[in-house]
């Protein structure tokens, strides 16, 4: 009966039985496991059993030590989805603006960029070039938008989920860029041909 989760408790769930039924009914079902934050050993075991792809958010990757599990060269499995950002993160440009000088230097060096304005496309490039089975980005990254285009700030109320894309954000240049990047990184799905009768 609490209004928040502070008074809640963890309860044992059906574990893999739930995912077995989902897979029986839907196949893989297009599910991506949100495996961010603190993941306990029993949850890791369940994730392995379910075999759903986990999440790799590039904004979590840039610890100047270089050993972050979110850096593309550190992915332990291709069975993951790499994101340039999510609805709960700032845009890549907004995120970069808030970094300390040392981390900014590391990000630029890692991505091979000189200017902050190059960052959103560089993020998309490394996501697409990663070994992750799935790569995702946002219209905000394609357009290079900053914090003004952020969708959600977790644990806040009032100004979330208000940002909207405009028709003019969907440009031929963006489409050509993504199409070409998808081609050169071999991420285009195979074309399904209709059988001729």
Tell where the protein language model's regions lie, with residue ranges.
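Catalytic cores of glycan-processing enzymes that make or break glycosidic bonds
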Residues: 1-197
């Amino acid at each position: 009966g609490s209004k928040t989760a502070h008074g809640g408790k963890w309860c044992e769930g059906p574990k893999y039985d739930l995912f077995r039924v989902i897979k029986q009914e839907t196949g893989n079902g297009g599910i991506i496991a949100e495996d961010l934050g603190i993941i306990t050993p029993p949850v890791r075991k369940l994730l392995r059993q379910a075999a759903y792809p986990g999440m790799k958010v590039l904004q979590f990757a840039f610890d100047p030590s270089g050993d972050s599990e979110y850096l593309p060269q550190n992915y332990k499995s291709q069975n993951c989805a790499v994101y340039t950002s999510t609805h709960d993160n700032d845009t890549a440009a907004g995120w970069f603006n808030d970094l300390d000088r040392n981390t900014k230097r590391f990000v630029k060096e890692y991505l091979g960029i000189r200017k902050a304005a190059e960052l959103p496309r560089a993020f998309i490039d490394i996501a697409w070039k990663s070994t992750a089975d799935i790569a995702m980005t946002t219209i905000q990254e394609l357009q290079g938008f900053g914090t003004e285009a952020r969708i959600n700030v977790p644990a806040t109320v009032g100004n979330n989920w208000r940002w909207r894309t405009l028709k003019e954000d969907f440009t031929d240049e963006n489409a050509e860029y993504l199409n070409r990047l998808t081609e050169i990184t071999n991420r285009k799905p195979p074309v399904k041909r209709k059988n001729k009768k």
